[in-house]
Amino acid sequence: MLKLLSIQQNEIQTEDHYIINNELDDLLNKELVELFLKANDCIDDENFLEAVEFYDLILKIDPKNISALIDKGVTLQILGRIKLSIRSFNKALELSPKNIDALINKGSALHLSEQYLDAIACYDEALEIDQKCSMALAYKGLSLGELGNLTESISCFKRALSIDKHCTLAQISKDTAQELLKSINPNSKKL
């Protein structure tokens, strides 16, 4: 009888614990949503330093929040804090190695620090995950262009446009690369 009573008490405690945990989770989720909204407001107002502070608060509550890590990295990149942004993207990739947003943004940060081959490696990794990722193709084209591989770069831009005909980055970059190629070799036909 005592054993049965003990089992019932454990079940009640477990059920209460479950209810309390759910309520705490709801409160935390609401708090995280509020912090994300405040960070987004800061971004809209171009108050990037304060946005980073909100991302830090989110990460204090939830250190494995991939969205906060990526958003913080992008914001740090805007602020010109490239090494810190790469560190933030790396943390996101440790948690989610196949996160395409983290890979593309890390590649973009590497591109800004003129590490074009490393940037291309990030874009290639993103393309292994999703062959139809037009942004990875467009950014890869930019890095190839910086390395002087205009023909390959144009090919990437065209592939990006075949996937997303509204990819402005790919369209503008393709036109620019074609003009550059034409100025280098006036006899070349349009690629």
Please give the residue ranges for each predicted region.
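Helix-start (N-cap) detector for alpha-helical repeat units in TPR-like alpha-solenoids
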Residues: L32, I66-S67, I100-D101, S134-M135, ...
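Alpha-helical segment of the N-proximal tetratricopeptide repeat
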Residues: L28-I61, S67, V74-I78
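Conserved structural position within tetratricopeptide repeats
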Residues: L57-K60, N90-E94, D124-E128, L161-S162
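Position-specific recognition of the canonical hydrophobic site in helix A of tetratricopeptide repeat
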Residues: I43, I70, Q77, I104, ...
